[in-house]
Design a protein with these regions (language model features):
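Cysteine-centered metal-binding/redox modules
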Residues: 2-128, 132-152
Length: 152
């Protein structure tokens, strides 16, 4: 049954998300090295509703679908003691929307600075890093919007 739910999620998302398999592979890598994943369940999220991207849900715990691990903002290599939080896709989307806005503001600031002072290797490198991060955030926002359409 666990695999069935995962396959249904894959079918629904693979049609609407370009390079879905790459994102799925990245999510699997993140899940396998995340400090909150104990090999069976995600210990960061508490699940009280069944409308979340999980391969399996049992006793308020979930086996996260790899695409959930791809968009998870709590991914960590170190375990931080803290309470479990209720999984809410809208909260995660809001987090990424705010992050996107912050990155865009910093990009504008850097571009203005580059226009004023001329070429700066440090500013150019920071700008490239921010553009890469922005692309990653935009991808996660698109994935989250698709997940919300499916699981609302």
């Amino acid at each position: 049954m666990e695999r069935f739910r995962e396959i249904l999620i894959d079918i629904a998302l693979s049609k609407t998300i370009p390079n879905y398999q790459d994102l799925l592979d990245e999510g699997k890598k993140r899940r396998d090295i995340c400090a909150y994943f104990d090999g069976k369940y995600c210990n960061k999220f508490k699940v009280s509703r069944g409308n979340v991207p999980a391969s399996w849900i049992s006793n308020n715990k979930m086996v996260p679908h790899p695409i959930m691990c791809f968009v998870c903002p709590y991914f960590s290599l170190r375990y931080y003691e803290g309470k479990q939080i209720e999984l809410d896709l809208f909260d995660i989307l809001l987090y990424y929307e705010e992050l996107k806005e912050t990155i865009e503001k910093e990009l504008i600031f850097i571009e203005n600075k580059m226009n004023e002072t001329g070429f700066s290797l440090l500013l150019k490198r920071r700008r490239e890093e921010l553009i890469s991060l922005l692309n990653d955030v935009v991808t996660k926002i698109k994935v989250l919007k698709e997940l919300i359409k499916i699981f609302r």
